[in-house]
């Protein structure tokens, strides 16, 4: 990939938030009987991506999926790779490659290997529409409270929300995609009057309740704040930025890493 293009993709922040957080309404979905007979691969490779058909197809499997509180199988990371100075990717810095071939860019003094492998597993669940894996990566209390909130306030569930997020990401790639790179940075302070984590959990007060962050710090071993970028390859082999400069929070509890999101 062209060096200038790659750098520009990773610095572009316009594509991240809206694509990743949108949710759909279960009552708005149409019957999937006709769509379920079609191949999801065929749908994904059309020039004009059919979001409704894709959502219906994956929702059939997601509705059957079970939530899991078992730790996901994370695999391992290879040795640190330092690109040559004249390499097109040198500006991205050092990386390590996971068992699935994803390049992970991170400072291991800020973000442990297990956290990064959990992040990879988490985002790969959106690429494969695997709700069981998704649920195994998310902090259980968050999942439970978000489920209750969606049911009460919006009349749909986490599976519907998950399917909508999978569909939005696939739509951004014009079809099915696979992860190629994940970059995690320590974010700058967003608000001088408070730290990032305090501000982050204040945004979820209506869902998680008052003093949630304060109580959370007593229940877990550590809370991590990160800013990440995700690149992916579409069915045509082109690598594109999928998510840019998006905040994410992890916790470590009993040796295991969980995502809030």
Regions found by a protein language model. Name each.
Residues 18-22:
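C-terminal motif of bacterial Sec signal peptides marking the signal peptidase cleavage site
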Residues 50-124, 128, 144, 152:
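Short, low-complexity N-terminal intrinsically disordered segments enriched in polar/charged residues
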